[in-house]
Structures are given as C-alpha cells and as structure tokens.
Amino acid sequence: MIFSFSRLNLYESCPYRFFKKYVLGNEEPITLPLALGKAVHKAIEDTINGVQHREAILNGLIEAEFHPEVTAEDVSFLASRSNAKPGMGKTEIHFILPLDDTEDAPMLQGYIDLVFNKGMAITDWKTNRVPYHVLDNHQVGLYAWAMNKLYLVPYVVGTLYFLRFKKKSSHCFMPADMEKARLWALGLANEINAKLELYGMLPEEFKRIFPAIPSSNCRHCPFAKECLRTFSAV
C-alpha cells in the first residue's frame, strides 16, 4: 500500500473506517464538501496555468463530475478568493517517496497544490468552513519534507489558505519540523503494515485489529450504522 497524509490521518482517527475504505475497498459517497473542493482546486490550478476564468470554472465543474450541489457561482467565488495569477508557481506537484532508507520502506505520496520560490514555499488551498492552524496536523509538514527531498532546500514556508475567509496559516518548516512529520507518518505506516499482515493471518479478528474510535466524525461517516451493529457485541 502506498500511503498519503489523508490515509494516515483517517487511520489515526478511526482504524475501522480506514479498514472499510482502504482494505475492503468500500467506496464512500462523494459529498458536497469533497466535490466542491475538487472543483475549486481544479479552477485555481487552471487559472495559474493560464486558463481563462470561465473555462477554468467549467473545468472545475467537470472535475467534480457536475455534482448536483456544486454551482458555478460557488466555484467562481471561492476560486477568485485565492488571488491566483498565471505563472505564480508550479501546480499539483506529485511525489512518491520512501519514508526511510530501508529496502522495504513504506512509500508516501502526495499532491501539492502550489510550489514556488524554487521549492522553498508551498500553498495548500482549503475550502473548509472552519479554519485551523497549519501545525494542527502533519499535512504541510510532510509536504515540506518532500520539498526538502526533491529540491534540497534548507527550509520551506508552508501555508494553508482558507478561501472562505481569505485567511492564511503559515509556518517556516525547518529540518526538525520535517523530521517530526516524517516520523509520525513512518510510525503509522509501519503500524498499518503490521496490522495488514496480522489481518491476512486472522481475518476473523478484524474488529480487534482495526477497532472503531467513536468521535464527532461519526456524524459524517457512511459506515456509522454498520459500525454500531458490528461493535455493539464486542
């Protein structure tokens, strides 16, 4: 399995939801926040790459597969708040890197929305309704670590840009910050791989190997009712 921040973050918040989605392959419905995020990201990416605004918005709607709740007005409004300009940087930079130097190291991949200043600055656009601090999780720290590996830069200024509020949360990630994020990812990746091996030997013990962690996230989880039935007898 190739890991990503979102996979690791999901596992940390609820191993059972991770199991349902990434081990059993159960698809989750495309919600409005997810579809809107995809549309806005595509519109901003196209704008930076020189596409005219109206065409960029249309491409965003196509990217979201014309989700019935996503409107061109919402996509245009949020994309415009990014202040994106043609040529301001490289967009959607994809990376796949080993998390350590061992032969069978877990692999981490990611897509960075915007890279500029020769890899020493990155931005991740957010359509969230609630802003948070860039250090509240390890997403941007991992992206900064990837920039360090790819561009050999001594530091990376990482920014979350919350489009609804035109609000930034930034931090200058030094090697120690990058290492902290890498170790977090490596620890979880190794834990998941160990559990996958155990599940391969004892599939009937899936409830103990990948337990559910009840939280406020259950309100938005498509597996919540099934989860309640599954774990009520444990």
What are these regions (language model features)?
Residues F5-Q52, E92-I93, H220:
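Nuclease catalytic cores
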